[in-house]
Amino acid sequence: MENKIYGCIDLKSFYASVECAERGLDPFKTNLVVADPSRGSGGICLAISPAMKNLGIKNRCRLFEIPKNVKYITALPRMKKYMEYSANIYSIYLKYMSKEDIYIYSIDECFFDFTPYLSSYGKTPREFAVMLMEAVMKNTGVCATAGIGTNLFLAKVALDITAKHISDNIGFLDENEFKKTIWHHRPITDIWNIGKGIAKRLEKYGVQDLYGVAHMDESILYKEFGANAEFLIDHSKGYEPCTIKEIHDYKPKTESISNGQILFNDYSFDDALIVLYEMVDQLVLELTQRKSKTDSISLYVRYSKECTASTGGTRKLNFRSSSYSKISAEFEKLYRETTKKNYPIRQINVGLNHIEEDEFQQLDLFGKVDDDKEIKAQKGIIEIKNKFGKNAVLRCSSLQDKATARIRNKLVGGHNGEL
């Protein structure tokens, strides 16, 4: 079996680095925050420059948490600009590698299969990573960090943990080095894919690091985590069989689409229903554009300052459709049945599950005629929005004071999208 070498490259403080590059500033010498001041002092900083990180300020802090004596530039988020930079950086990678050997993990992070290129370029894994990082820096002004490993998991952990303690910001891990340096690392939540929930469940058994996981009775892990225990067991030993090729080849049995938003302020039961309709409308148009239908919906509602437990649920529909009127009616039923009326609402997530292409459908002559008319209208709306912008056509409910669609249509990822 071929010995594999993988890389994982992260664009350092990406949004902040882009804003510094656009201003001709050095992110390592400039205090810069990417945030929207109009959201108040509690607004989250999407990124801070490396210079501010060196002052001990946390990356995802809120504006009021930045020490008063620290002077800094505030840059309004420009999501389209960051996407433009990300696409440009991906094109730089493609000058050195085939797209089949690259997996885009996020807007600022990619995995690579270095294996076929090391002999071709006559470079070590570290030298190859440096070549890519220097090309990005030269062409965009954005600095990067990297992790190198003998599998994808080790490359990611080398990036997230090991690289932070190396002068050239490039970490390396094989299974032996992993056991020496990562097995006893704490907190365990620093490890990729281990969140606070998993950590809390492991703590019940006195386990606080991957060494503890590796030496647990596997039957206990399977009882606690089900099928997901396999990932924990493999990763606790530094093992990951999945390859980039397998990721590219993977086709899920069923697909789903979702939409979520954190509201700018507390919403009443009735006002939140307006937003729910808007979010369902957006999902249904996406469903129509995919030429697909759904037979399952899901809803999640979180209340202000966690004053009460979140609510929601998943519902199987007795029909498969992409009709807004049918799907929105089912969402309203689910909302009214599960949502607490007397608590302020701060977050809503909606989802359409079991999405399949509209190849076969049960015969329902009268229902189909009505559906066809509505789908035709939805396709017309999509064409108008694509040509004239998302706000060119809105439902009447989106003109109400508590509606958010008009504002959110100008955003990308919930933030300002302008260049």
Question: What are the residue ranges of the model-derived segments?
Answer:
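Catalytic palm subdomain of template-directed nucleic-acid polymerases
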Residues: 112-133, 206
